[in-house]
């Protein structure tokens, strides 16, 4: 049962379980990524893992430089410290289930990010980075290759 729906820019997050529901063991949410949506910048988690299970469409995750396509019924595990991000490069909306262990990331993070992204105009990147860091998501700029 959906507890709460949060619109974060173009991505929709539907929370199913949060820390209070699971004695802190897991948080679980579905997220829907429209075709061509702007998605989170590459980042890593300091204190939790994330497991993604594909529900519809195909998302392309980049985990530590490796591209992994996640379709319905497929999974991707993102360990602590692994730099990752995702995109929807296909022609249909994509939906996946995310499980956070332990439950250190909840709806409040997405609400704070939504305030920044939904404010209109270009997002305040500095504020966004501060909110991410506050919740243990560390922005990671891609390494530039030497010319």
Range-by-range predicted roles:
Residues 6-42, 49:
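A short glycine-rich, His/Asp/Glu-containing loop-to-beta-strand
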Residues 112-147:
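Acidic/histidine-enriched, glycine/proline-rich intrinsically disordered or flexible terminal extensions
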Residues 30-34, 44-62, 99-101:
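Short, conserved beta-strand element in jelly-roll/cupin
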